[in-house]
């Protein structure tokens, strides 16, 4: 396994107040998205430095005062996010998979998580971080091999609902954990077979 520690470009003081330009939030967000895509395609884990924030800025690079903090509060322990950073690093991803991950990628433009796995149910449960409150306030749909389809409606307090399921699949094995914003899979429907999984925005957003 490969783990990337403390990656990322420092945030300049001006970045919090401007959208365009080399130090603007759009350019900054694009840089982080492209970096996150590389990590996803490589299948590596990563962390972002200074999660708790830093009140003081320093001159790390040419461009003026900057900080590594992902929060912009004036306190040490921040809660006001720099969302042009946090919305990227907190993207959906397969946190724990019982079996082998073949590939995964979150597309920020379409808000689609593509995940290919070869499950092994003898290894326990799987967890996929969705972050619905951030990325899917309009709900999301889960497609497995296109013949097992479920969805989550944030306006209803019923968890994951099933649109269609193949023979032998048990929808009750799929549990939505609202507190952790994770999809917990107790058992995959097709053990030791390659599965093509998609998480897409919207309720019943499928053909």
Model feature map: region roles:
Residues 1-10, 44-50:
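Structural recognition of the beta-strand scaffold that forms the well-ordered cores
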Residues 14-145, 181-206:
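Aromatic-rich peripheral "rim/lid" segments of glycoside hydrolase catalytic domains that contact
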Residues 101-102, 147-190:
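Extracellular/luminal ectodomains and secreted, surface-exposed scaffolds of diverse proteins
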């Amino acid at each position: 396994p490969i783990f990337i520690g403390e990656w990322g470009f420092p945030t300049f003081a001006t970045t919090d107040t401007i959208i365009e330009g080399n130090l603007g939030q759009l350019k900054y967000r694009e840089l982080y998205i492209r970096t996150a895509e590389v990590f996803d395609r490589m299948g590596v884990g990563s962390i972002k430095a200074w999660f708790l924030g830093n009140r003081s800025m320093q001159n790390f690079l040419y461009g003026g005062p900057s900080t590594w903090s992902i929060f912009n509060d004036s306190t040490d322990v921040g809660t006001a996010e720099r969302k042009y950073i946090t919305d990227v690093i907190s993207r959906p991803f397969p946190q724990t998979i019982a079996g082998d991950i073949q590939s995964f990628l979150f597309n920020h433009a379409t808000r689609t998580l593509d995940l290919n796995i070869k499950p092994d149910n003898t290894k326990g449960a799987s967890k996929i971080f969705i972050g619905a409150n951030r990325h899917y306030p309009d709900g999301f749909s889960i497609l497995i091999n296109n013949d097992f389809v479920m969805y989550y409606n944030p306006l209803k307090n019923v968890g994951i609902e099933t649109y269609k399921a193949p023979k032998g699949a048990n929808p009750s094995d799929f549990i939505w954990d609202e507190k952790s914003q994770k999809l917990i899979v107790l058992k995959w429907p097709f053990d030791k077979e390659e599965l093509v999984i998609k998480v897409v925005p919207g309720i019943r957003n499928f053909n």
